[in-house]
Amino acid sequence: MSLIQNPILRGFNADPSIIRVEDTYYIANSTFEWFPGVRLHESKELKNWNLLPSPLSTTTLLDMKGNPSSGGIWAPALSWADGQFWLVYTDVKVTEGAFKDMTNYLTTAKDIRGPWSDPIKLNGVGFDASLFHDDDGRKYIVQQTWDHREYHHPFDGITLTELDTNTLKLMPETARTIYRGTAVALVEGPHLYKLNGYYYLFAAQGGTVFTHQEVVARSKTLEADSFETEPGDVFLTNVDTPDSYIQKQGHGALVSTPEGEWYYASLCARPWNRPGESIYDPRGWSTLGRETSIQKVYWDDEGWPRIEGGHGGKTFVEGPKDAIFTESASDNSQQDDFTSPALDPNWNTLRVPFTAKMGTTGNGKLTLIGQGSLANTHDLSLIARRWQAFYFDAAVKVKFEPFSYQQMAGLTNYYNDRHWNFVFLTWNEINGKVIEVGENNRGKYTSYLKDNAIKVPDGVEYVWFRTKVRKQTYSYEYSFDGVTFTEIPVQLDAAVLSDDYVLQSYGGFFTGAFVGLAAVDYAGYGTQAEFYQFEYQELGDRLAADGSYSWEAGETRDK
């Protein structure tokens, strides 16, 4: 057997729901406002994973137009029963303030690659809904419950509601609170299992930050308030292990191997610190977002699940004895020459699918039609992919003929509508077509070059842009021939593109950093930009003293 190195899914892959069907494991992850909805991977060994088509790929299944940043798909729950896959997902429409307006849906498929059935509306009681298939044939939705009343705690326990197996509609008269969590509060992310005569409830607590944790409770019945919390040590948390390489573990799901070994897939993060910062306060900046880790589980003498190595988990985990080798790429590097009429599955758009309104792809180029700015949450032409390594380069060739400063096209590093950076071609009154770098930081926009924007020489048709992400900082380069690149003298703080930074000023945000291509024409003339030869080249997660890169990791963080 081989060791599994965490995280098993690098970059923004939060809230894992893991299952096994025969000899194949599947993980579904949250995607929030990014389209298509729900990210799926498969493996036969838990170590190497391959990306599958996303199930929510049409507006029939998911319409997020107008959704706020970090709204959308929260904590999808994948299950297998009755010869088909079942997927429950939450579409959150309101994130700020007292209310969490949302709708939970159910879709099914015989094949994990689809087609998926039209969605069935379940309810809007709370988020993080999952489906439990009892061994007597009955089915239940278990979910967090939201209370908007300012004189109550908004997290109102875990509600269980029976699903009519004929109509696939919920029966609200059966709803009851089965668990209220512990004093840590903020109980959410429930998954229910029946094992050895007990119902085991796995639930997250403590919020989505460094205090995050997973608790386990169990009961002989599904009656109201019948679940007893696991005694002694909490199941999984890094709140008291600040030195650990893997942080923020908690929300996740349980799975068994064919040979009867047990594993737990969890969200996690790998924060880093700026020079001089303590790893204790602040705990760090997680620019890759919340990723997916896996930990091995054993059962104690009292029948409670425990994490091998203690509740903080480990970076390196013993793989299953019955693992079947899964071939996958050595990293997540991507080269896209845009020859296909459909976008590569690594690309994502915001809230809505890629359509002719945004542009076209194929025949060796991507054409984007300029729409709103990158601060727009309704109409914008942007495709982006996750940062999945601490050190990488990304480059693209661009053709664009702006005639106004309101028109921009280029390469962006993006977190959400209030936090992004952009190197782009535009126009100004001094030099005509120029290169500028702009940043939106907590909603405040800054032009870095201003009147010193770099003039594009007359007769130059194409400009190449490259971003060099170096864990704590990143920068941009340009070229007029695709061979010789010149660095733009602006060094940017990567922490600005992290959940942790955004949380200092706003409510919960959950998505991690992306690198992407965008065209803007907020003047409304639909100016088009052409993109060629995109390359995302991962270098590694660690920089050695000799300047070399590697994927090496340890059980403890770099100090």
What are these regions (language model features)?
Residues 1-559:
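Carbohydrate-active catalytic/glycan-binding domains of CAZyme proteins
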